[in-house]
Amino acid sequence: MNAELLISLVPQTVAWSAKTSSIMILCNVLCIVSARYIIQNKNKGTALPLSGSFSTFGLPELLATTSLGHIIGSGTILGFSYIGLLS
């Protein structure tokens, strides 16, 4: 197919701004905090130098939660831009 045709079919997304970055950060923080209560087998891999209630959080848990946070954040940003909340 023609490349121009394919490019014209892709919807225009919002530019990266403070609003979009704050949504992404919020989604990542929510996933990390919720994982504290959801993950049952913690600290199975390399430990992270964290203190407090996240001291049992390891590298696998951090990578998993931030990956999920980016997926949820991307969907949230695309959804908000589609309905017009982000411009």
Swiss-Prot record:
GO terms for biological process: photosynthesis. Pfam families: PSI_PSAK. SUPFAM superfamilies: Photosystem I reaction center subunit X, PsaK. It is found in: Plastid, Chloroplast thylakoid membrane. It is a multi-pass membrane protein. GO terms for cellular component: chloroplast thylakoid membrane; photosystem I. Keywords: Chloroplast, Membrane, Photosynthesis, Photosystem I, Plastid, Thylakoid, Transmembrane, Transmembrane helix. The chain crosses the membrane at residues 13-33, 62-80. Belongs to the PsaG/PsaK family. This is Photosystem I reaction center subunit PsaK. The lineage of its organism: Eukaryota, Cryptophyceae, Pyrenomonadales, Geminigeraceae, Guillardia.
